[in-house]
């Protein structure tokens, strides 16, 4: 098992650039879960993670890469699509007793893919009813499929929540390495940050308490050298693709890569 997770750590870091500490925290937690999975029954998902940090630093990519490397199906649910009062129906479905009843996107996916990764992207944008559904998954590991009227089990799922909450931490230049910020400080920032539109906290206290008992990872800012490396890798892939399709041979002056960083 140890060798498996060492290889997983290496392969994920090759794809998710500049986030070694966050990757390490996630891998260690998954390793611990696998070691302890035979010690008794547990409620809730197999593992859950809250990834916090600035936009565009690889939070969603980290979750996606974990699923690809573990070779399990995954689904990414953008919570901005679940910001209205009745949007939760898209997740759990509507009763087939009514005309137009249909199965929910989330429960259908988990019913068909018991071992899977679920990414709730930008969780702070979710409507309150959606948050309550997520609480039920975290606490009980089940969700009622409104269409089939049967419970769907989430016990073998790995759940990632991503969030851009925590601006007081990642906008503070004194915090050089975000991934080293102690968990209690991160939790306090999550609990106290308010939605500028409603002037209410982004997260209800109930979900904060539940997330605090799980795995919380602060994801680091993207350093200039890492950004440059990502740009170079993407350009190499693009050039290779053009060469295979059209036979083009392209050479780029190294200084040109730096220009892309400011576009």
Model-derived features: positions:
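AAA+ P-loop NTPase nucleotide-binding core of proteostasis motors
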Residues: 1-263
């Amino acid at each position: 098992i140890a060798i498996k997770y060492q290889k997983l750590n290496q392969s994920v870091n090759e794809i998710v650039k500049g986030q070694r500490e966050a990757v390490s925290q996630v891998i260690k937690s998954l390793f611990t879960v696998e070691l302890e999975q035979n010690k008794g029954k547990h409620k809730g998902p197999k593992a859950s993670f809250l990834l916090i940090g600035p936009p565009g630093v690889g939070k969603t990519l980290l979750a996606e890469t974990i699923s690809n490397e573990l070779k399990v199906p995954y689904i990414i649910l953008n919570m901005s699509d679940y910001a209205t009062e009745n949007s939760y129906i898209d997740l759990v479905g509507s009763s087939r007793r009514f005309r137009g009843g249909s199965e929910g996107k989330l429960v259908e996916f988990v019913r068909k893919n018991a071992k899977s990764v679920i990414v709730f992207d930008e969780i702070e944008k979710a409507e309150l009813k959606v948050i309550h559904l997520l609480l039920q998954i975290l606490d009980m590991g089940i969700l009622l499929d409104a269409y089939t009227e049967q419970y769907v089990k989430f016990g073998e799922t790995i759940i990632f929540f991503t969030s851009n909450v925590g601006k007081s931490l990642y906008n503070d230049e004194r915090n050089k390495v975000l991934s080293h910020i102690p968990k209690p400080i991160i939790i306090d920032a999550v609990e106290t940050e308010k939605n500028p539109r409603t002037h209410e906290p982004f997260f209800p206290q109930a979900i904060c308490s539940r997330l605090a008992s799980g795995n919380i990872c602060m994801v680091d800012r993207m350093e200039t050298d890492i950004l440059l490396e990502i740009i170079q890798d993407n350009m190499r892939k693009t050039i290779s693709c053009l060469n295979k399709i059209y036979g083009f041979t392209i050479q780029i002056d190294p200084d040109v890569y730096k220009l892309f960083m400011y576009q």
